């Protein structure tokens, strides 16, 4: 079974004043298996952001399914959506969204603290990720003390 499966995804926006319909996504289908990496590329206005917003449960499709571990996330409640985002998604923004008054370790721990994880679990989760991303040596530094590439890796670890 695929980790993520997108079936016949369609998104149509209706303009506010003229009521014109703009089709942002048409019959999008793909699957992602565990361990695979996916890049979404396309021209400006091709629907990349719309697709990502639907995958992140920030927007609903007009029709179609988004299956994560076999569960259709397009039909879950607002409370379930918040839990889904916290437990299954990670966002890496272009500006990194790191807090300069927190060291890198605390920036990584922040979403775990908000999820009420205990310190031993946070430390256990951080160790292999920091090693894999090559950031063990910068965990006690602050974001303003590291390079852009290192900031990106800290954001990925978070």
Predicted feature locations:
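ABC family nucleotide-binding domain
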Residues: 2-158
């Amino acid at each position: 079974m695929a980790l993520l499966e997108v079936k016949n995804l369609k998104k149509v926006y209706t303009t506010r004043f003229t009521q014109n319909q703009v089709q942002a996504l048409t019959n999008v289908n793909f699957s992602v298996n565990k361990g695979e990496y996916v890049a979404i590329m396309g021209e400006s206005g091709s629907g990349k952001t719309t697709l990502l917003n639907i995958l992140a449960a920030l927007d609903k499709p007009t029709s179609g399914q988004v299956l994560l571990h076999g569960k259709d996330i397009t039909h879950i409640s607002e409370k379930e959506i918040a839990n889904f985002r916290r437990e299954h998604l990670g966002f890496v923004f272009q500006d990194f969204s790191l807090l300069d008054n927190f060291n890198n370790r605390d920036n990584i721990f922040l979403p775990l603290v908000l999820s009420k994880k205990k310190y031993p679990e946070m430390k256990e989760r951080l160790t292999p990720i920091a090693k894999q991303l090559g950031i063990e040596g910068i965990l006690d530094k602050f974001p303003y003390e590291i390079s852009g590439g290192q900031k990106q890796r800290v954001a990925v670890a978070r």
